[in-house]
Amino acid sequence: MAYYQNTGLPTAASMVVTPAMSDVSQEDPGEGFGPSKLGVRTTVDEPLSASQAIEVLQAGNRRFVQGDVKAGGLGPDMRRALASHGQRPVATVIGCADSRCPVEQLFDARPGDLFVLRNAGNTCTHAEGSMVGSVEYSVAILETKMILVLGHTGCGAIMGATKLFLERSTQKYIEMTCRKDAQESTDQSTEASEFEQPPQPGCCKKKSTLLGLLDALVPVAEQACVELEGGSTEEIAAHAVKVNVWRTINFLLSYSLIIREKVASGEVELQGAVYNMSSGAVEFLGKSPKQAQLLNYDGHVVPSMGGLARQVS
C-alpha cells in the first residue's frame, strides 16, 4: 500500500469503519459470497486468501450453472453498509465487455463481492493504461489476493482479430506471388502495378480505434494459428481465446512491478479461466505456463503506474 501513498488514492487504513449496524441482521443476506459480517463484503471483513477466493468463485459458478443462485438482492441496510464501510472484494476479475458475459452473475456475486474490469477481449495492451493501474489498485489497496483473467467462448474481438490476421496473411501471400511473377517476367510493363500505384484521394482514412484494438489482438490469432496449424477459422479463434488469456496474464507479470512482486512473494495469485456461454460453466485454467520464467527474468521491467509512484516516493 506504500506504493500509492503519494497518489491521493484512499488506502484501507484511511477508510472509516463504523460499528456494525444493529438492524443489518434483520435483512435476508442470502448465503453471500464468502464470509461477511454485514451481509455484504466490506472493509470490516478480512481479505480472503487466493485459495479461498478461487473456491468461492468455483462454488458461485456451480450455483449459476445449476440455476440455484443465492446472491439475492440488496436491502437498504446492505446498501448503506457498502457506502459506509468501503469495499473488500473477494477477487479481481478481468473480463470481456461482451454483454452476454455478466461477470457478477456467472459467479453468483453481489455488489461488493468482486472487483470487475472489462473491455473488448479482456486484454491489457498498455503498461501504463487504466486496466493495469486498476488491477494494481485492487491488490495494493483493496487487498484482493486473486486476479482472474476471464475469457469466453464466441468472443467477437478474438474472432475479428483472427479474421483480420488470416485476411492479411492471404493478401500478403498474393502480393508476394504477384511481385515475384512480375520480377521474373521478361515482358516488363512500363505501367506501375497495382501495388505501386499512388494512393488515390480519399482512399486513406484514419485508422479507427476499433481496428487498433483488433491489431493488438492479431499476435494472439497468429500464435493460435501456429499452434493449431490447419485449423478452420472457428477452431483457430476458439484456441485463440485461451492464448489471449495467457497473453493478458503474461503482460501483467511483465509490465506491472506491483503485481509481479506480489505474485513472486506468493501473496497474490494470477490465474486464467474461460467462460462457456452455452453451458454457463467456467473452466479454471490455473497459472500461466510461463509464470516461473517471467518471474525469473532479470531484465528491465517497464514501470507501471504503481511502479512509477513507488519510484517517486
Regions found by a protein language model. Name each.
Residues 90, 152, 276:
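Acidic active-site catalytic centers that drive phospho-/nucleotidyl reactions
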Residues 149:
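Conserved functional hotspot residues or short segments at active or partner-binding sites
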Residues 91, 114-115, 268:
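A broad, low-specificity signal marking well-ordered, structured residues that form hydrophobic/aromatic
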Residues 95-100, 120-123, 152-155:
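Short glycine-enriched loops at secondary-structure junctions
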Residues 88-91, 96:
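Glycine/small-residue-rich phosphate/adenosyl-binding loop
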Residues 2-86, 111, 121-145, 156-313:
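Divalent-metal-activated hydrolytic enzyme cores
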